[in-house]
A protein has these predicted regions:
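C-terminal binding/interaction regions
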Residues: 115, 119-120, 133-163, 168-170, ...
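Conserved helix-loop functional segments at active or binding sites
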Residues: 52, 225, 262-266, 351
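Flexible, glycine/charged-enriched surface loops at secondary-structure junctions
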Residues: 56-64, 162-165, 228-235, 265-276, ...
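Active-site loops and adjacent core secondary-structure elements that bind or stabilize anionic groups
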Residues: 1-197, 212-230
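Gly-rich Lys/Arg/Thr-decorated short loops/hinges at beta-loop-alpha junctions or inter-strand turns
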Residues: 22-34, 107-113, 187-206, 283-305, ...
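Active-site-proximal loop/turn and secondary-structure-junction residues that shape catalytic pockets
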Residues: 69, 123, 235-238, 340, ...
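Glycine- and Gly-Pro-enriched alpha-helical subdomains that act as flexible
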Residues: 71-110, 240-340
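C-terminal accessory/binding modules appended to enzymatic or scaffolding proteins
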Residues: 197, 209-210, 214, 218, ...
Length: 390
């Protein structure tokens, strides 16, 4: 198959639409459904991310994409009991690749509603069973077990999008893109991200444990496929907050940091103790938790309202309790796709438990950024490599 006709492009008025190869066969097979234009943008970007993440870490990897940026990405380390609870995966059998996807989707479950999933490894029944429970547009993987494919084909009334990609496919070294009838040409960003990038530690504190190195690689590879400007917070093998497509660096850091704070707060005892009414849908639980953690908590706790969601009216999680809980957190890594121009990014990041930073460096104020890290004992590595993605 050299081309695949699509229903329309980004919007219904954008016709005709297709994906095609000028030379050779498309490296994919559509095993189920009818993926659209944006689905394929998500699929091909997310596949590159998980493929490179597995190559860099040696672990199964997964991503959850929305509108051509990752809402989350992760490697397949086992889940704790608390993580199983906040990801609605209690009592489920979870293979390493299933753990990777559960973590990737769990980074920001609200943003992952209707996501495109990407798996570095063959999709097995464990992963398919979890996907079947979630609202998702489709999945790309290098293969599917018979049982997994049968499960996925029952999703969305049989219309769930399932794409298989040739894991050995390698694109051309030069890529093209048309904008306003004008063709842009550039070398593909084939820069390999690995531990050698982390050797230039510029702070007084140079203690970088293996777990932090892994998390730095996850941050950098996630950023490589996130619309710029972008910042990514990572902890324990998974993204916990991705700030994408912002026009100032500090807004990226704040956006991603606020998402990371929400991830941390979902593990607060008051959140873990929320008692939901029987039969509540997973998206409704996600929405309720998100509102409960926000300043608009009365929208779900008001008299006559809370009964729709909770069996018992929850106690308010106060601003003081939130601040105290987040202040106790540590071991978080943050990555940036371009240099931090000011120390304010470090000041914001450390409020979310950040102890490790990886970024290109190259600002005229690098000395100030380094000094801010030194003030808090943060370890920072300069990679010398910008990772813009558009």
């Amino acid at each position: 198959m050299t081309e695949l006709e699509l229903k329309y492009g980004c919007n219904p008025n954008q016709k005709p639409a297709r994906i095609f190869m000028e030379e050779g066969e498309l490296p994919i097979q559509v095993l189920n459904g009818k993926p659209g234009y944006i689905n394929f943008l998500d699929a091909f970007n997310s596949w590159q991310l998980v493929k490179e993440l597995k190559e860099a870490t040696g672990l199964p990897a997964a991503a959850s994409f929305k509108h051509v940026s990752p809402a989350g990405a992760a490697v397949g380390t086992p889940l704790t009991d608390v993580e199983r609870k906040i990801y609605f995966a209690e009592g489920m059998e979870l293979s390493p690749i299933a753990c990777a996807y559960v973590r990737a989707r769990g980074a920001d479950r609200l943003c992952s509603y209707g996501d495109w999933a990407a798996l570095s490894d063959v999709c097995d029944a464990d992963t398919a069973r979890y996907l079947a429970l979630e609202v998702s547009d489709g999945v790309i993987a290098p293969g599917y077990t018979d049982e997994a494919l049968a499960i996925l084909k029952t999703k969305r009334k049989g219309g769930y999008n399932v794409v298989q990609i040739d894991p050995d496919y390698a694109p051309k070294a030069v890529e093209h893109k048309d904008v306003f009838g004008i063709t842009f040409e550039q070398g593909r960003n084939s820069f390999a991200i690995n531990e050698a990038l982390l050797d230039n530690i510029v702070t007084d504190n140079k203690e970088l444990p293996e777990s932090a190195k892994r998390d730095m690689l996850i941050a950098l590879i996630t950023l490589k496929y996130t619309q710029s400007n972008s910042v990514c917070y990572v902890k324990d093998g998974q993204a916990i907050g991705v700030g994408a497509g912002q026009q100032s660096r500090i807004h990226c850091t704040r956006l991603a940091g606020n998402k990371a704070d929400n991830w941390l707060l979902r593990q607060h005892p008051k959140v873990l103790g929320l008692s939901f009414v029987d039969g509540i849908r997973r998206p409704d639980r996600d929405n309720a938790i998100d509102v409960y953690l926000s300043d608009e908590y009365e929208d779900v706790l008001a008299d006559g309202v809370w009964q729709n969601t909770f069996e018992i009216r929850p106690e308010v999680l106060t601003a003081e309790e939130k601040k105290e809980w987040i202040a106790r957190q540590s071991g978080v890594t943050v990555g940036s796709d371009a240099f931090f121009p000011f120390g304010d990014n470090v000041e914001r990041a450390r409020k979310s438990g950040v102890q490790y930073i990886v970024q290109p460096g190259g600002s005229i104020r690098d000395d100030h950024v380094i000094a801010t890290c030194n003030k808090y004992g943060i370890v920072m590595a300069f990679t010398g490599m910008r990772l813009f993605h558009h």
